[in-house]
């Protein structure tokens, strides 16, 4: 089966992960939808990680170079994924981080710099480790019953948007966190105090917030970008009674 798909930033390739006969050993494939093929035929897929008995996974598509992916491959240690930089056009793999620290995830800023790593212990507690040079500094921690995730960076890459329900919070809330000072600045939570924070949409060109959203019986958007709001309202008028969403 397939395990999700991505478009590259330039729309040149569709990327997807796939195993063989349900064995859960995943490879990453690329297909060019614009490739010229005979009528009734499909473009040929390329296996970018032609290794046996591995579970490769895509962590991020590059925001600066559409020919680059950040992926994880557990070829060295089956329990943990090392971080690689993959060049789509050539299949070249470059090791970015050898995972000997129980790292379960990686987060990159707007310039594709590795900034935060997620480390999980045997009890299910998770630490956010801030990367400064070769040093990894713990900056945030959640227990197994709490949630926290990074949902992008601010305009100058100095702070990240954190969605969390740590501590006495009943519902997930959006904050802006400074990884150096560890200071949290409240941004937003559900005005009706009924549902978790739903989603944050950021403009990849301006790096500013487009909208936030919350989902109960339907999804409600709070717009900060007038142009996007106008586009949304136009589509709502075209499809009355339907829910409209943007995907990228």
Outline where the language-model segments fall.
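Peripheral, non-catalytic segments that deliver or gate enzyme domains
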Residues: 1-3, 9-248
């Amino acid at each position: 089966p397939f395990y999700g798909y991505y478009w590259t930033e330039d729309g040149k390739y569709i990327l997807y992960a796939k195993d063989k006969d349900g064995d859960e050993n995943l490879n990453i494939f690329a297909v060019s939808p614009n490739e010229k093929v005979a009528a009734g035929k499909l473009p040929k897929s390329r296996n970018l990680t032609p290794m046996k008995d591995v579970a490769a996974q895509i962590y991020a598509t590059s925001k600066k170079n559409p020919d680059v992916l950040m992926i994880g491959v557990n070829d060295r240690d089956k329990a943990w994924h090392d971080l690689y930089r993959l060049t789509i056009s050539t299949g070249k793999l470059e090791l970015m981080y050898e995972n000997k620290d129980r790292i379960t995830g990686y987060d990159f800023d707007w310039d594709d710099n590795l900034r935060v790593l997620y480390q999980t212990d045997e009890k299910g507690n998770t630490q956010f480790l801030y990367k400064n040079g070769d040093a990894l500094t713990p900056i945030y921690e959640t227990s197994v019953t709490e949630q926290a995730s990074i949902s992008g960076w601010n305009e100058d890459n100095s702070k990240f948007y954190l969605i969390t329900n740590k501590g006495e919070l009943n519902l997930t809330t959006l904050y802006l966190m400074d990884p150096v000072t560890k200071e949290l600045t409240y941004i937003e939570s559900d005005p009706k105090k009924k549902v978790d924070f739903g989603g944050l949409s950021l403009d990849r060109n301006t790096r500013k917030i487009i909208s936030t959203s919350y989902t109960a019986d339907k999804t409600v958007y709070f717009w900060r970008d007038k142009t996007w709001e106008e586009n949304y309202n136009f589509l709502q008028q075209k499809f009355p009674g339907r829910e409209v969403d943007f995907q990228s």
